[in-house]
Swiss-Prot record:
Family designation: Belongs to the short scorpion toxin superfamily. Potassium channel inhibitor family. Alpha-KTx 14 subfamily.
Disulfide bond is among the record's keywords: yes
GO cellular component, one term: extracellular region
Keyword annotations of the record: Disulfide bond, Ion channel impairing toxin, Neurotoxin, Potassium channel impairing toxin, Secreted, Signal, Toxin
Function: Potential blocker of potassium channels.
The keyword Signal belongs to this UniProt entry's keyword annotation: yes
Name of the protein described by the UniProt record: Potassium channel toxin alpha-KTx 14.1
Location relative to the cell: Secreted
Length: 54
């Protein structure tokens, strides 16, 4: 049971880290800034292959 909770905690921390880095609960992949302008409000830039949504 402890292993299950440890895995659950790791998944929660990783998802929060992705949320914090990208500003959204989902990591939105992009190739150009134009991809992000269609997927995120506020015309964000594409950094390291992911949209910098706010």
């Amino acid at each position: 049971m402890k292993i299950f909770f440890a895995i659950l905690l790791i998944l929660a921390v990783c998802s929060m880290a992705i949320w914090t880095v990208n500003g959204t609960p989902f990591a939105i992949k992009c190739a150009t800034d134009a991809d992000c302008s269609r997927k995120c409000p506020g015309n964000p830039s594409c950094r390291n292959g992911f949209c910098a949504c706010t």
